[in-house]
Amino acid sequence: MSNFWLAVVSAQHVRQGVEFGIVQTNHGKPQGIRRMSPGDGLVYYSPKTSYPDGEPLKAFTAVGRIADGEPWQSDVENFKPWRRKVHYDLSTDVSLAELQPQLEFTQEANWGYQLRRGVVPITEHDFALIRQAITSTTA
């Protein structure tokens, strides 16, 4: 059985992850990606264009499925982030406001607090809704 995840990452970092076919969350810490398994669905929500001082974006920016294999620790100039391989779909950014009334994870009054964890589980309904919206607008 697949799980479905929402990762909170700046759009700039999402684009880099898509380019390299990887997921990296929570500033490279392993906890979030260790919860993911091959076949799990992954959606990115980007509150800003870049971290830490980017412009507000509040959009879903990528979607994919976790690939086979285990997380590994990369070594990038004194930075050793944990990563996993991902098969990304072609997608276009879609604003949170456009989908919010239909999303289950936004129905609680303080739903935004959970996003501070960086990686949160979402329902299959929310994953499918977001995936359909951001992949249907690509050429």
Swiss-Prot record:
UniProt-listed Gene3D superfamilies: ph1033 like domains
Protein's organism: Renibacterium salmoninarum (strain ATCC 33209 / DSM 20767 / JCM 11484 / NBRC 15589 / NCIMB 2235)
Family in the record: Belongs to the UPF0310 family.
Protein name, entry field: UPF0310 protein RSal33209_2865
Organism lineage: Bacteria, Bacillati, Actinomycetota, Actinomycetes, Micrococcales
Pfam family, one: EVE
SUPFAM superfamilies xref list: PUA domain-like
Coiled-coil annotated spans: none
